[in-house]
């Protein structure tokens, strides 16, 4: 047992490492080599310290870079990386070796520390990829606390290749400890190491211009090499001013969208209570491919029509990074203009951003956030007060006996929403933003407290069956929520959407779409980023079907449906939606061309809309000195 984590006395999940069964000859050979190395006595000529150091550092960088690729990729994928990219990976590793050498002046110790650090980074990526289906990058470092909080619900399994990596690294470390090379004069050695590191960095920088950080599946490792891809993700943390950005460009947009306009559709005499449910991993997998199940998975969701806008929306994430979906909904901004793999809550929110929260607070709403998990997850304990939420409710505010698998149920979350509604003052306008946890991955373990009712017909994927059973449970809880608010007299609007699709067995996707997760067209790829949504009211608002939108537009649709005057930024989004109905981190849907395109391939009016969108988003997020208070009004104190 590696470890366990508890939530009070409720969560009891052990994390197990699989036993790797090596052939006898492998273990015998390892033993012979290991004890042979241990018995060696190696004395190096101190007069040749520079030569020995150069050999040790160079071979250490090469061995570590190739060792990492061997750990992360099978032979077929390893063969895809070009020699030039592999050289860049070796140089990245060498920079680490050189940097450590400056501080140790002991080349053997340098090689030991550098190899362990780099291999540990690759080891983290090894498990992160197993759990969420994409790779660990620099911005994920800020998510470590969140990752550790849910790590106990996953199985940590080492495959045979990982076992060989451990054996080879053990032999390397044992050998390197036999080599004693140190420098009495540290300053000359440090100058040489720093100079070489700078030259390596310059070479890497020159040859990575235009190279993008890959975050889809294992593309980072087999297109760029893992270490290089990680380094590129560091570069992406620095946001450049977009082309065409200026105060004058922002002023032009101010002149177009500086006045609020009333929405003529769906106005109500009293402002409605607005309830948002962002449902964890809630998805309709049939958009990816057809399959059959033994029961109807979401009969209640499917029945919703009256007073409902309903359809599908593009998320910008797959399998993880929930807060990016939350951020797109609340702010109207898009991950399309931010680096791949970034997490906005942990990287870019340092003050009070203009959002649905600030806009509703400015017209008198009490804003409440609910999330039945730890407040530190994705730094929500910092972000929510910055956003201006009046109340926050986290796991300690929920009944922790009401769990399914290891997470608070949707039913318990909805009952908490009802309780807060019933306790509101008679003249209180209420906005509740809730984020569920029930359906969180992984889906491989069996639980005594969960009777899985749904299963696929004709084929057996245990994790898929568990996921589908969870969605079925969510549907029952959703029926409770809607049924309750159907009966209340005051106007209520409920916005419901999934944050992203789940990360399931990689072997499931070829069955579902005939291709799997690789070699997809942009349109096929966007299917994996598609989630269901609806906006329902308990008052007359008509029914509408939306074939496709995106999460950044949903708050604008919600304000329109609620009869609330659109702030300037939402006016812009409403107009843009007419030309570009959906946009996310992967691309956008061009109405004029009738197909998905990458943002950089936009032309004509599409390019104009996207450029103005990027300018406004940059002004809102990064140009604090020149932020437009007309388009992005501050929260009134």
Name each model feature, range by range.
Residues 204-276:
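Membrane-interface segments at or immediately adjacent to transmembrane helices
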Residues 141-144, 224-227, 231, 247, ...:
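Alpha-helix initiation and N-capping motif
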Residues 1-14:
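Single conserved hydrophobic/aromatic residue that forms the stacking wall/gate
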Residues 12-221:
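Transmembrane and membrane-interface helices of multi-pass
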Residues 127, 131-140, 159, 243-247, ...:
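A diffuse structural propensity rather than consistent per-protein peaks
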